């Protein structure tokens, strides 16, 4: 087993390593986002190298990290993380609006995203949100909360990654799937107990929540908890 205790650099973020490894042969350590959050793990590379990852606890792997480089053979072991797609919300339209409207919209957008427990990074007048549910669900959240005037699209994680710093990339893509899927889709124009879509996934504390929404204004919930 080859022990990896330090990250040498990042071929996608560091111009020095990008130049240094130009023409090198890459042996990839392929990880999903959950695996990338572990500071300690053992896994084989695509070329069969048995790698033991033992990093400091506050260090997580990012796509493009260089784990080892053999100058004689010109072979580098590179981390490849399968990135999620990203919802990109364009905030530039808000610059045309009054300061009061801009503040109100940004506050409401932040509240809506936070209410879903969605990670987000704001940069270059855009908000990047990694997908944790279907695009149709995220589309519904945006539209039913009244953000139709904000252009948004869905992009590949690999398209967004070069726009981010290392810390931003780790925040956006690090363990996005571990966040609770906690989706509420209900129009603010609906009646207080109007029909809406409420999806609660299994939370990290081990409970699952199932709500039977037959509202007759008694607000009865059939709660089923798995201990």
UniProtKB/Swiss-Prot annotation:
It comes from the Bacteria. GO terms for molecular function: nickel cation binding; unfolded protein binding. Residues 192-227 are annotated as: Disordered. It is found in: Cytoplasm. One of its GO terms (cellular component) is cytoplasm. Residues 209-221 have a biased composition (Basic and acidic residues). One of its GO terms (biological process) is protein folding. Its main location: cytoplasm. Keywords: Chaperone, Cytoplasm, Nickel, Nickel insertion. Pfam families: UreE_N (PF02814). Belongs to the UreE family. Involved in urease metallocenter assembly. Binds nickel. Probably functions as a nickel donor during metallocenter assembly. HAMAP family: UreE. This is Urease accessory protein UreE. It comes from Yersinia bercovieri.
């Amino acid at each position: 087993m080859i022990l990896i205790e330090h990250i040498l650099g990042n071929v996608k973020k560091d111009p020095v390593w990008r130049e240094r490894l130009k023409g090198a042969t890459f042996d990839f350590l392929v990880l999903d986002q959950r695996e990338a959050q572990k500071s300690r793990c053992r896994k084989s590379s695509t070329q069969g190298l048995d790698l033991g990852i033992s990093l400091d606890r506050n260090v997580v792997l990012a796509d493009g990290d260089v784990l080892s480089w053999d100058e004689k053979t010109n072979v580098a072991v590179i981390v490849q993380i399968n990135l999620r797609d990203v919802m990109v919300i364009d905030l530039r339209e808000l610059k045309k609006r009054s300061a009061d409207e801009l503040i109100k919209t940004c506050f409401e957008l932040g509240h809506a995203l936070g209410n879903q427990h969605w990670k987000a990074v704001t940069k270059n007048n855009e908000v990047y949100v990694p997908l944790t549910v279907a695009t149709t669900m995220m589309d519904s959240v945006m539209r039913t909360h009244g953000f139709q005037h904000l252009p948004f699209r869905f992009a590949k994680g690999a398209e967004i990654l070069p726009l981010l710093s290392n810390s931003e990339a780790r925040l956006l893509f690090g363990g996005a799937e571990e966040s609770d899927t906690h989706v509420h889709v209900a129009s603010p124009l609906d009646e207080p107990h109007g029909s809406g879509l409420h999806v609660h996934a299994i939370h990290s504390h081990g409970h699952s929540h199932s709500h039977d929404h037959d509202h007759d204004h008694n607000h009865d919930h059939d709660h089923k908890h798995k201990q």
